[in-house]
Amino acid sequence: MSLLNLAPQTPDQNLINSLQKAGLLESPVDAKFTVLTGGVASEIWKVETDKKTYCVKRALPKLKVEANWFAPIERNRFEVAWCKIVGDIMPGSAPQIYYHDEEKMLCCMEFLDPADHALWKAELRDGRCDPIQAENAGRVLGRIHSISSSDKAIQEQFPRIDIFHAIRLEPYLEATASKHPDLKEVLFALSKLTSETRPVMIHGDTSPKNILLGPNGPVFIDAECACMGDPAFDLAFCLKHFLLKCLWVPAEREKFLKCFEVMVTAYLAEVSWEDRSAVESRTAKLLPGLFLGRVDGKSPVEYVTEEGEKNKVRRCATELLVSPPSRLMDVVDHWKKELNR
C-alpha cells in the first residue's frame, strides 16, 4: 500500500479491536495512526508500532464520489484472496497480507514505502513515462492471468460476479449510457459480454494509481474488484490511461503512446489460454467504452476538466464504439487523429 496525502486522526474502536485481536496492536496509545487518502472505495490507515508498520483497509458500502455508487463490502475478502494468490504465483507483485477480519471486512497488509515504491500515476503525471515500466506491467499482468486460467483452486475462490458489476461495469459502462442514449445498446452489450467472459482471475482496477514501481518490478495494489473475469478488462483499464495522459501532459504524448504499444506487446506474449487475437479484439472493442466512461461515467478522471478535451475523448470513443476496431493500435491511430484536430 502506498503512502499518499497524510492526515493524522484516530480510528474507531471496532478497528482497534480487530488489530488487537490479530496481535498487531497492543495499546493504541503507543501507536501512530495516519489516514491514507487518494482512493474512494475504502477507509485506509497507516499504523506504526514499535514492532511493525502496516496498512489497514476497510471497505466502504458507499464510495466517496458525488454519484450514488454502492458496492458490497465483501469485496475486501476477494482483495485478500487476490493478494495471497499473486504472492504465491508471482512473489513481490502484490502486498503481503498479515490479517483479515471476515466479520468487519477489513484487512491488514504490508506498507510499501514510497521511497522505493513510486506511484506510477505520479511518475506519469510528472512526464516520467518509461516504456520499460509499461513492458514490465504488461508482462506481469499477463503471467498472472495465464497462471490463473488453468488453476481450478484459484477459480473456486472467486464465485461472485455481482461485485465486479456494481463497482466496474455499471459505473463505467452502463451509467455512461445515460449521457449517450445513442450508444446505450453498444455499451450495455459490452457490459454483458465482459460479465459473461470469465477465463482468468482479474484484478479489476489496473490503473496506474494502483501500480507501484518497486525495485523488483511492478506491485499491484487495491484489488477490491478481483474476480474471475475477462482479461480484456484489466488490459483495457490500464491502457486507457495512456490515452488520457496525452491530455494531462501533452509534451509527452509520444512516450505515452509508446507505453501503450509496448504494454500490449508484452501482455499478449503471455496469453496462453485462448488465441491472442481474440483477447486483443475484445480489448480493442472494450477500451473505447471505458475511455468514454472516464469522462461521462460515475468516476470521471480528475485531470480532464476542459470541455474541449472532454469532447476529444467523446468524439474518438464514439467513433470507435460505432465502428469497433479489432486491433489495439487502431485505437491509437484514431486517438492521434483526434489529438491533431
What does each model-found stretch correspond to?
Residues 1-33:
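Juxta-kinase regulatory segment immediately upstream of eukaryotic protein kinase catalytic domains
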Residues 2-14, 110, 143-193:
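Active-site catalytic-loop/activation-segment of kinase and kinase-like phosphoryl-transfer enzymes
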Residues 3, 251-254, 290-341:
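ATP/Mg2+ or Mg2+-diphosphate-binding catalytic cores
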Residues 24-31, 79, 184-196:
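Short Pro/Gly-enriched beta-strand edge/turn motifs at strand-loop
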Residues 34-50, 54-56, 189-233:
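Active-site acidic catalytic loop and adjacent metal/ATP-binding pocket
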Residues 36, 41-153:
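ATP-binding pocket architecture of kinase catalytic cores
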Residues 81, 232-273, 287-305:
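Active-site activation/catalytic loop segments of kinase-like enzymes and analogous catalytic loops
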Residues 270-282:
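Acidic, serine/threonine- and proline-rich low-complexity regulatory regions
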